[in-house]
Every structure is written in structure tokens, then in C-alpha cells.
């Protein structure tokens, strides 16, 4: 699927921090965007200011007619959406192109020089700093939080270089193809998804193996790469 040929994009769970960054990206690149979320928020208000139509009731009657043409519409959803969600199941049952958020992020960044930041802690701060540093060279950054100096979770640049906050939830980061990646930490988290810490660690190892160029890791993590530390001997230290 070539995203350049998709002109209408509907988000199920558009108010999520990761979903809203992608919605901003498409809207500011001239795509027609709309979506559903459970409750209004500052994030959904910001999206509406961009001209994105959002509703807060799970009902087919609320889907704008422009998004009911399955040959022209991409549907993006978050794994946090309930399996019995009426709108999502309508799109699935009627053979729309339906992709998870992580799959779409992977497709957006696959043709860029991608720098991904993963870790159970520290990835939002690190990716925000990296995105800010690379803003003068027109990198596009997808963040997992609102950067105060940009008032956004998207730093929009060109499509040559990207910075991505790589989320381990639901193994989402395995949809990325990073050239350079950083892993800040690997604590036992999301065990409702992974079941045990060993499975989480295996997922990080799989992510590390997808890096085509350079992997940078906090010292002490069970991954092979350049190391960094504070007041300890490492490849890079402060």
C-alpha cells in the first residue's frame, strides 16, 4: 500500500498520544482526516483546530460519508480500542484497509532515515530532545508526549529523516525499520501483554536486531551496541 495514494484517513481512537501525532501528520500533509475518540480532551481540541472532524459516540451514523468509500479510505486504530467497537468492526467486516497505529507509523518512516528511541522509561524525553536537535535539518519527529516548546507531539519537517518514539506496548516497535536506535531501559512492564519479563526482553532483542546501522544502549542492558552511562565507564559518558 502506497500512502501517497490514500487521501482519506479515519482514526478509531484519534485522541491517543501516538494516534494524534499521526493524525496531525496526515492532516498537515493535505489528507482528509476524521476520527472517533471516547472523550474530548486538549488533544482532540487541538486536532479539531486543524480542521479534523471528531465525534465521541461509537455510532456508524457519525462517520462522515467521505470515509465510507473503502477504495479510498485507510482506517487506523489503536490496540486500546475494545474488540466489540461498532465502528471498527464495521470497517473490518466491509473489507476496508484497516491497520494498527504502529503499522502506519512503520509505513510512514520506512523510506526515511529513521532514528527510533525505545525503552520502558526515558523514551519520550530522549526522543523529544533528539527531535529538537534535528529540527533545523527538517527531521519529522513523532513523540509520545506534548513538547512544550512546540505545543505538539509532532515536529513536522520533511520526509528524509524521522525520529520515532518506539513503543514496546503490544510489540508495536517491531513494525519499525530503524537505521539508528537507542534503548534507554528495559524494566518489567506491560506484563499484561508479555506475560513475563523474559518475553519483554526477547521483544527488545528482536527490536535491536532490526537496526540496520547503529544501536546505542544504556550500560547494563542485555543488548549489544554502543553504551552510554553517567559516572561509569562506557562508550559515551557524562
Model-identified regions with their sequence ranges:
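ATP-dependent carboxylate-amine ligase
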Residues: 1-54, 70-75, 91-96, 128, ...
Amino acid at each position: 500500500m502506497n500512502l501517497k495514494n490514500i487521501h482519506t484517513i479515519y482514526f478509531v481512537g484519534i485522541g491517543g498520544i501516538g494516534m494524534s501525532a499521526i493524525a496531525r501528520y496526515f492532516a498537515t500533509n493535505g489528507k482528509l482526516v476524521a476520527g472517533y475518540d471516547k472523550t474530548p480532551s486538549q488533544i482532540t481540541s487541538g486536532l479539531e483546530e486543524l480542521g479534523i472532524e471528531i465525534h465521541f459516540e461509537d455510532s456508524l451514523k457519525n462517520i462522515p460519508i467521505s470515509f465510507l468509500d473503502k477504495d479510498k479510505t485507510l482506517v487506523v486504530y489503536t490496540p486500546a480500542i475494545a474488540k466489540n467497537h461498532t465502528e471498527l468492526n464495521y470497517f473490518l467486516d466491509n473489507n476496508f484497509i484497516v491497520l494498527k497505529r504502529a503499522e502506519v507509523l512503520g509505513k510512514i518512516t520506512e523510506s526515511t532515515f529513521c532514528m527510533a528511541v525505545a525503552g520502558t522509561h526515558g523514551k519520550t524525553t530522549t526522543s523529544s530532545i533528539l527531535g529538537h536537535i534535528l529540527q533545523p535539518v527538517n527531521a519529522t519527529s513523532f513523540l509520545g508526549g506534548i513538547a512544550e516548546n512546540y505545543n505538539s507531539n509532532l515536529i513536522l519537517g520533511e520526509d528524509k529523516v524521522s525520529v520515532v518514539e518506539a513503543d514496546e506496548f503490544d510489540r508495536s516497535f517491531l513494525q519499525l525499520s530503524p537505521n539508528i536506535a537507542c534503548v534507554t531501559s528495559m524494566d518489567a512492564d506491560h506484563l499484561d501483554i508479555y506475560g513475563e519479563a523474559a518475553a519483554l526482553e526477547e521483544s527488545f532483542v528482536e527490536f535491536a536486531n532490526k537496526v540496520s546501522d547503529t544501536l546505542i544502549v544504556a550500560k547494563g542492558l542485555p543488548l549489544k551496541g554502543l553504551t552510554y552511562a553517567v559516572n561509569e565507564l562506557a562508550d559515551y559518558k557524562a
